[in-house]
Amino acid sequence: MCAAPKQGNTLIEVGNQTVIQGQVWHDGAPVAGAYVRLLDATDEFTAEVVTSPEGEFRFFAAPGEWKVRSLAPVGRGETTLSAGVGIHETTVKID
């Protein structure tokens, strides 16, 4: 019989990681199902995730300059940040 092993909660040590996380907002409410892209300092696409029902997203990245861009049916938005080791919170507002 072939089956995946039972899954459980996994803890990740973020003390030596660069984590970029946050929420996507539009008109004062979180945006669920928005595509969020992580672009490097040269605007090169690096990763993409879909926001949770609460509009949340998370990326594990290298330290550096980053652009976070959101694309949703209600519009698009972006923000830039400089991220070192640690957890970096950001908000992407869609106009």
Task: Please report, for each region that a protein language model flagged, where it lies by residue.
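Hydrophobic loop/turn residues within beta-sheet-rich immunoglobulin-like superfamily modules
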Residues: 60-64, 84
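Short, ordered, surface-exposed loop/turn motifs in non-cytosolic proteins
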Residues: 20, 26-42
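A short, solvent-exposed beta-strand micro-motif common in secreted/extracellular proteins
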Residues: 63-74
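Structured interaction patches on ligand/partner-binding surfaces of diverse proteins
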Residues: 3, 73-95
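Short, acidic Ser/Thr/Gly-rich low-complexity loop/linker segments typical of extracellular
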Residues: 42-56
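Beta-strand-rich domain onsets/edges
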Residues: 1-19
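Short strand-edge motifs at loop-to-beta-strand transitions and within beta-strands
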Residues: 55-59, 88-90
